[in-house]
């Protein structure tokens, strides 16, 4: 039997699937199928299902139903939307952004402009590029935009693009499935976009993204879809991107060191952050 909430998550009619093998409508990943085949319990497995060709991303628990010591006659399965799990995790972990636009102190015309642009960005839906020297408060503005936006209840995931070695960059950003490469964690790893699902992904020092990966990230941002390394399922990712840089990206584009398409995807809204030395009335 298929309970109402599970049917809603999977997009299936409970009456239509009664008496039929569930695999006729639902395709599951290999490790989940292996657990079912061998009658093993599953605890908090992140699952990528295909339900009549539609991807469903959820957390699944399976409890075998046995009579005596025999092979299980079935399973009790509980499913939860992965976005719900992420929201609970970030609430418990204290990962909600706490900065507000009122934390942008100062009375200068420049800081008032930044505050107005940040308010407009918070109301909008486009990706945001924050430009300015190191130390001008780009991280504060990014958090404040997130917290003033309709995504405030979602996670705020901050990533320093300079922190990852080149050979690990894609696996860190796109995530990977179990066994995707030598040394990969057995349980796999979600992409940064999945971690930010329903919220904001803040890409600090975006100029440090290796050029050969620009087209991949640009495509994820454009389509709102990601496929983990070694994976076969496309995962929808509803994420807003805020990027920051202390570099003239237009100059990098002209030099061939930054892809124009990625810059276009990142900069629906551009906010220039002035250094304190240019706004003496705020000192």
Set out the residue ranges of the language-model regions.
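N-terminal capping loop/helix in small sensory signaling domains highlighted by a polar->aromatic N-x2-3-F motif
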Residues: 1-7, 11
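Sensor-regulatory modules in signal-transduction proteins
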Residues: 49, 65-67, 276
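AAA+ ATPase active-site-proximal loops
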Residues: 96-236, 240-252, 275-276
């Amino acid at each position: 039997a298929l309970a109402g909430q599970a049917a809603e998550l999977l997009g299936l009619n409970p009456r239509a699937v009664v008496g039929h093998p569930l695999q006729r409508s639902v395709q599951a990943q290999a490790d989940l199928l292996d657990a079912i085949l061998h009658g093993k319990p599953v605890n908090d497995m992140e699952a990528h299902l295909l339900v009549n060709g539609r991807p469903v991303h959820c957390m699944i628990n399976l409890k075998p139903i046995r009579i005596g010591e025999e092979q299980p006659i079935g399973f009790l399965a509980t499913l939860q939307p992965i976005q719900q799990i992420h929201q609970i995790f970030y609430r418990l972990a204290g990962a909600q952004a706490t900065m507000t636009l009122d934390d942008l102190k100062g009375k200068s015309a420049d800081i008032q402009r930044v505050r107005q642009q940040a308010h407009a960005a918070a109301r909008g839906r486009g990706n945001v590029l924050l430009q300015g020297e190191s130390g001008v408060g780009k991280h504060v503005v990014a958090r404040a935009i997130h917290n003033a936006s309709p995504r405030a209840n979602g996670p705020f995931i901050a990533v320093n693009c300079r922190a990852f070695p080149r050979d690990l960059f894609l696996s860190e950003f796109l995530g990977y499935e179990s066994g995707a490469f030598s040394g990969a964690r057995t349980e796999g790893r979600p992409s940064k976009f999945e971690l930010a699902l329903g919220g904001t992904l803040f890409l600090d020092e975006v100029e440090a993204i290796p050029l050969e990966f620009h087209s991949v990230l640009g495509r994820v941002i454009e389509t709102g879809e990601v496929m983990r390394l070694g994976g076969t399922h496309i995962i929808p990712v509803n994420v807003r991107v805020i990027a920051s840089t202390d570099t003239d990206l237009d100059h990098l584009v002209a030099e061939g060191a930054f892809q124009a398409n990625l810059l276009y995807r990142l900069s629906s809204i551009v906010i220039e952050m002035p250094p304190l030395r240019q706004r003496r009335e705020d000192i």
